[in-house]
Amino acid sequence: MRTRQAGMSLIELMTVVVIVAILASLAIPAYRQYVLRANRTDAKTSLMFLAGALERCYTRYNSYTYDTNASLGCTVAFPQNSENGYYSIMTDGSVGGKRTASEFNLVAVPQGGQVKDTGCGNLSIDQVNTKAKSGSKSLAECWGR
């Protein structure tokens, strides 16, 4: 009488390895896109917060411009990093930003691993809450629905 061996054959093991590899090849790119999309909220949150701060300055001092003396104007300085550091918030003209006494355009420029988010690229907002992006994706995809 033959005794039956316990365990898996090499073919069974290789079948499992192939299935795991196929699942990983589908899941990893989807996960990376999810992480980029989730990190985008860092830019949106920071842009909205800073736009609100500039609006409060405008309400109080009738100007969006920076002044180190709080009694003479707004003290919100740029550039600065977003809360989690995935973006640098700028008003620099080289990235499409602007800040004058009567208007502003804040631009969130991706930093570090977030630069791979080429679909949305730079996100921006201005004094009338007009939102924009520099990538190829739609505005709704980048800023939310």
For every predicted segment, state its role.
Residues 5, 14, 54-55, 114:
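Glutamine-centric residue-chemistry signal
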Residues 36-63:
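Membrane-proximal N-terminal amphipathic helix
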